[in-house]
Amino acid sequence: MATSQRKILVTSALPYANGPIHLGHMLEYIQTDIWARFQKLRGHECHYICADDAHGTPIMLKAQQLSMAPEEMIAQVQKEHQQDFADFNIQFDNFHSTHSDENRELASEIYLKLRDGGYIKSKTISQLFDPEKSMFLPDRFVKGTCPKCKSVDQYGDNCDSCGATYSPTDLIDPKSAVSGATPVMKETEHFFFDLPAFEDMLKEWTRSGSLQQEMANKLGEWFEQGLQQWDITRDAPYFGFEIPDAPGKFFYVWLDAPIGYMGSFKNLCNKRSDLNFDEFWAKDSTAEVYHFIGKDIVYFHSLFWPAMLEGAGFRKPNSVYAHGYVTVNGAKMSKSKGTFIKARTYLDNLNPEYLRYYYAAKLSSRIDDLDLNLEDFAQRVNSDLVGKLVNLASRTAGFISKRFDGKLAKVADASLTETFLAKADAIAEFYETREFGKAMREIMALADIANAFVADAAPWQLVKEEDKQEEAHQVCSNALNLFRILVTYLKPVLPKLAQDVEAFLQLELTWDDLAKDLSGHEIAPFKALMQRVEMKNIEAIIEASTENLQVAEAPKSQLDLDPISEEISFDDFAKLDLRIARIAKAEHVPDANKLLKLQLDLGGETKQVFAGIKSAYAPEDLEGKLTVMVANLAPRKMRFGMSEGMVLAAGPGKKDLWILEPHEGAQPGMRVK
């Protein structure tokens, strides 16, 4: 029993709203869900909060590729995410989005408090700019060689190989991840968060025990290197929140993403009159706040986030808990091997509680990678859950229903029950400290004891003897009571199984009732609770995951979609007069959905052309550009005016159209030949 009720807010890192959830992601949500369910089982007030991380350039570009508005895309992805989580029995108290009114208000509030406190600095910087896409490149959209360890193909903000953080301008041989072009430097004004001003506070917070030792050690290295001011600005075009006092400037996604924890909780408070936002987030809050994250985002959660909260007058989290990555069969998740498994692919083939248990059995409080060995997975689930746990009930419940009117006997010898109850505090401590693997080992050791008791007593033999009926009744009742205790211990890990067992035993499984006397209690007829994992199901998952990759790796080529036309003679081609033209003016055409009106300078002569490129270009983006036109096309009278030629463009249409642009040095009027 919980000695006193705690107020707890727990979060998982926000999944990014540009793609599906996979089994690597699921480790964190399963870990957090188990911990939150345990706190609730112990009688504490615990709120598990999450949201989709819905801002940033990747989402903007993905939406463009799909010819969707970003808002439409993130709503669709959020629906898919929530269904995957629900089917994995992840029990959020609230799942929201960072693209919300609550988050916008809180992000603005925190920014303005930091600005007014003198923690926001403004300066002009030189930033990498994609000359082909006419956009500044976020850190993650520049790739190159790490300046520290020389690992190739690293992102512009940190190195996956050595963990170093740096500016994208520090990369060796940088390339735009959007177009592949070599970026150029361009000046822009940005706002910076003064992280070094919080160094003393962060050092003290690190020493307070709020972080795992591995995290604290890593922070020590970062302190030695010296903290840097943090760029919190992104230039348009960008999908996110505009900075209140800076039109055309947007908050970097990593500023408003962690604020999404607060935004989601604020949304929950708005739905419930019994919750007070300030009780959890005010500076003097006595509630507990915990963040579960992956080891790849430690820097943001252990430095920027607590410093932002401190500077804006909010409380800091009690602890930040990091976990490692998921490997499959001892190697990095691989699409080519079929081990990059989406949550939905798994759910289509296997019970989600199998994975919940397997992850729990291998999780500890350390930041270690966890290997999902698929053969071991099948063996462990079949041995522990089917062979030990469920088998305990399946071997004894039938006798209670058929021979003893479905009622449990009072057990004369309570020594086994006392042994099981004596482990409650140790198991609770393992859950509390996130040593789930140790908890599972304790529980399965008890299951072994219970199964040995049943095997030795052999109730299937006792029921055959007239004078052994009471003994058989007691053995089966004892076994089912031990089964009840085991499933109660496992309830945070296996909530659906626990629900089914509650229906079978016709009682609620609670930690406070572990020692409850069940003599005379009536149970329902036993129904199968779990099936064995068959390797054919695992093979189907691998096949489906590999098949998905093959489809992705072999799209139809442009030539498949648009075959080359029939041959023409050179004389036919020579009739075309292709010329370089400068777009002197571009403007919208009233009442025309697809056309822009272009004035094309041929170096002494101007031609007017109506071009069907409105879906891909704004007029202001075209003016001054060089392009290629068919100069000797017969004029065509249109209802908007006379069109005196044609500009050349490539692409299937809509947003995917690109006008041809000659290399530097070409001049208006030059013939293309």
Curated annotation (Swiss-Prot):
<feature type="binding site">
    <location>
        <position position="146"/>
    </location>
    <ligand>
        <name>Zn(2+)</name>
    </ligand>
</feature>
<keyword id="KW-0694">RNA-binding</keyword>
<dbReference type="InterPro" id="IPR014758">
    <property type="entry name" value="Met-tRNA_synth"/>
</dbReference>
<keyword id="KW-0963">Cytoplasm</keyword>
<feature type="binding site">
    <location>
        <position position="162"/>
    </location>
    <ligand>
        <name>Zn(2+)</name>
    </ligand>
</feature>
<dbReference type="GO" id="GO:0004825">
    <property type="term" value="F:methionine-tRNA ligase activity"/>
</dbReference>
<dbReference type="InterPro" id="IPR009080">
    <property type="entry name" value="tRNAsynth_Ia_anticodon-bd"/>
</dbReference>
<dbReference type="Pfam" id="PF19303">
    <property type="entry name" value="Anticodon_3"/>
</dbReference>
<dbReference type="GO" id="GO:0005829">
    <property type="term" value="C:cytosol"/>
</dbReference>
<feature type="short sequence motif" description="'HIGH' region">
    <location>
        <begin position="15"/>
        <end position="25"/>
    </location>
</feature>
<comment type="subunit">
    <text>Homodimer.</text>
</comment>
<keyword id="KW-0030">Aminoacyl-tRNA synthetase</keyword>
<comment type="function">
    <text>Is required not only for elongation of protein synthesis but also for the initiation of all mRNA translation through initiator tRNA(fMet) aminoacylation.</text>
</comment>
<dbReference type="InterPro" id="IPR033911">
    <property type="entry name" value="MetRS_core"/>
</dbReference>
<dbReference type="InterPro" id="IPR041872">
    <property type="entry name" value="Anticodon_Met"/>
</dbReference>
<keyword id="KW-0436">Ligase</keyword>
<dbReference type="InterPro" id="IPR012340">
    <property type="entry name" value="NA-bd_OB-fold"/>
</dbReference>
<dbReference type="InterPro" id="IPR002547">
    <property type="entry name" value="tRNA-bd_dom"/>
</dbReference>
<dbReference type="InterPro" id="IPR004495">
    <property type="entry name" value="Met-tRNA-synth_bsu_C"/>
</dbReference>
<feature type="short sequence motif" description="'KMSKS' region">
    <location>
        <begin position="332"/>
        <end position="336"/>
    </location>
</feature>
<keyword id="KW-0648">Protein biosynthesis</keyword>
<feature type="domain" description="tRNA-binding">
    <location>
        <begin position="572"/>
        <end position="673"/>
    </location>
</feature>
<dbReference type="GO" id="GO:0046872">
    <property type="term" value="F:metal ion binding"/>
</dbReference>
<dbReference type="InterPro" id="IPR015413">
    <property type="entry name" value="Methionyl/Leucyl_tRNA_Synth"/>
</dbReference>
<dbReference type="GO" id="GO:0000049">
    <property type="term" value="F:tRNA binding"/>
</dbReference>
<feature type="binding site">
    <location>
        <position position="159"/>
    </location>
    <ligand>
        <name>Zn(2+)</name>
    </ligand>
</feature>
<dbReference type="GO" id="GO:0006431">
    <property type="term" value="P:methionyl-tRNA aminoacylation"/>
</dbReference>
<keyword id="KW-0067">ATP-binding</keyword>
<protein>
    <recommendedName>
        <fullName>Methionine--tRNA ligase</fullName>
        <ecNumber>6.1.1.10</ecNumber>
    </recommendedName>
</protein>
<dbReference type="InterPro" id="IPR023458">
    <property type="entry name" value="Met-tRNA_ligase_1"/>
</dbReference>
<dbReference type="Pfam" id="PF09334">
    <property type="entry name" value="tRNA-synt_1g"/>
</dbReference>
<dbReference type="InterPro" id="IPR001412">
    <property type="entry name" value="aa-tRNA-synth_I_CS"/>
</dbReference>
<comment type="similarity">
    <text>Belongs to the class-I aminoacyl-tRNA synthetase family. MetG type 1 subfamily.</text>
</comment>
<keyword id="KW-0820">tRNA-binding</keyword>
<keyword id="KW-0479">Metal-binding</keyword>
<keyword id="KW-0547">Nucleotide-binding</keyword>
<dbReference type="GO" id="GO:0005524">
    <property type="term" value="F:ATP binding"/>
</dbReference>
<dbReference type="InterPro" id="IPR014729">
    <property type="entry name" value="Rossmann-like_a/b/a_fold"/>
</dbReference>
<feature type="binding site">
    <location>
        <position position="335"/>
    </location>
    <ligand>
        <name>ATP</name>
    </ligand>
</feature>
<keyword id="KW-0862">Zinc</keyword>
<feature type="binding site">
    <location>
        <position position="149"/>
    </location>
    <ligand>
        <name>Zn(2+)</name>
    </ligand>
</feature>
<dbReference type="InterPro" id="IPR029038">
    <property type="entry name" value="MetRS_Zn"/>
</dbReference>
